[in-house]
């Protein structure tokens, strides 16, 4: 897209708008006034801009952004005041990392330009004490991507890249810090690709051979079970899982880290608790912590399949859960593929009715 922007801050807002951000959850700071001005100017000129939602603390701001992203599937954005606002995000930063949701977290940063040298340069004493060696380091290990906007950057491109990364599966938070003199730098005409023009990567399709193997194991299992946690992030997965469970007479249980409604809790095949040690086939679908290690964990002899957009859980340093196969796939796509395959196999186990009756007690 090509825009006329008085300063880099206007380009930041324009790129958010072009990237599908409709709400900016905002906690104010002296270096963040460019957001308010750019949004007000866009509205006055009849152009689209994110709606600025004012909050008085960063934890509810980021949690609100996560809730919006979870309920709509769209990216949300936040803005916080320099390093202290970034630290105020607190535990919500952890929630964002584990959420699988696209959120662009922004924060102002103090100017470092000497007084009088440029627009937005230091003009008050607090700017010296806000200056850190690495503000982004506060949240780096929790982010999919982070960047500090610099004078040589194309501000619209930086925002589009942030949204591209946040919205690419597995979705997650990204962080962009915006020094005041950079946000207020005169710009004029600016051209940049939108996040969609950069290209949001489509969810991975499951490996056909792996799906065939898992489907056969489930079809011919004596006691199959499926563990869920995050698959309900996409509501379309719920009826697919119900159909698969009913076709197989398969027990479904929430993992110890349940985060979404994945399966109807009043369905006869839903289990509040289950002893996985007696199951011969166990599938963990989008579940970070599928079960607690111990006597009720799957037997070493059981066939265990893990299906996830990040099946190896690369963000968790120590991860001891074993698996016979790990399949990289979006939960909804995997359920579609499994349903097709179990129907192709065509066999319904004679024990299916008995299993249904047993797990429904």
Feature map (PLM): residue ranges:
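Cofactor-binding active-site loop characterized by glycine-rich and histidine/acidic residues
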Residues: 361
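N-terminal alpha/beta PP-like core and its mobile active-site loop of ThDP/TPP-dependent enzymes
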Residues: 1-358
């Amino acid at each position: 897209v090509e825009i006329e922007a008085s300063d880099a801050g206007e380009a930041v807002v324009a790129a958010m708008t072009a990237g599908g951000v409709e709400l900016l959850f905002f906690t104010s700071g002296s270096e963040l006034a460019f957001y308010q001005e750019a949004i007000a100017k866009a509205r006055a000129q009849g152009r689209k801009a994110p709606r600025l939602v004012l909050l008085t603390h960063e934890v509810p701001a980021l949690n609100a952004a996560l809730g919006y992203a979870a309920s709509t599937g769209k990216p949300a954005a936040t803005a916080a005041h320099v390093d202290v606002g970034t630290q105020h995000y607190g535990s919500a930063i952890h929630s964002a990392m584990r959420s699988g949701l696209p959120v662009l977290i922004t924060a102002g940063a103090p100017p470092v330009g000497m007084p009088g040298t440029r627009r937005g340069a230091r003009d008050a004493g607090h700017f010296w004490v806000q200056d850190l060696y690495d503000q982004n380091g506060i949240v780096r290990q929790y982010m999919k991507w982070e960047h500090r906007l610099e004078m040589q950057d194309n501000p619209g491109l930086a925002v589009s890249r942030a949204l591209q990364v946040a919205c690419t599966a597995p979705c997650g938070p990204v962080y962009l810090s915006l020094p005041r003199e950079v946000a207020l730098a005169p710009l004029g005409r600016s051209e940049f690709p939108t996040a969609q023009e950069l290209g949001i990567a489509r969810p991975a399709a499951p490996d056909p051979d792996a799906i065939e193997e898992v489907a056969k194991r489930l079809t011919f299992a004596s006691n199959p079970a499926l563990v869920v946690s995050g698959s309900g992030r996409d509501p379309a997965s719920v009826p697919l899982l119900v159909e698969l469970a009913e076709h197989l007479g398969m027990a479904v249980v929430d993992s110890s880290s349940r985060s979404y409604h994945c399966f109807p809790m009043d369905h006869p095949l839903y289990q509040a608790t289950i002893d996985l040690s007696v199951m011969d086939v166990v599938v963990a679908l989008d579940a970070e912590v599928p079960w607690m290690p111990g006597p009720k964990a799957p037997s070493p002899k059981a066939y265990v399949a893990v299906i996830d957009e990040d099946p190896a859980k690369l963000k968790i340093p120590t991860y001891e859960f074993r698996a016979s196969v790990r399949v990289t796939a979006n939960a909804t796509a995997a359920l579609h593929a499994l349903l097709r395959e179990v129907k192709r196999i065509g066999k319904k186990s004679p024990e299916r009715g008995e299993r249904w009756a047993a797990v429904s007690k």
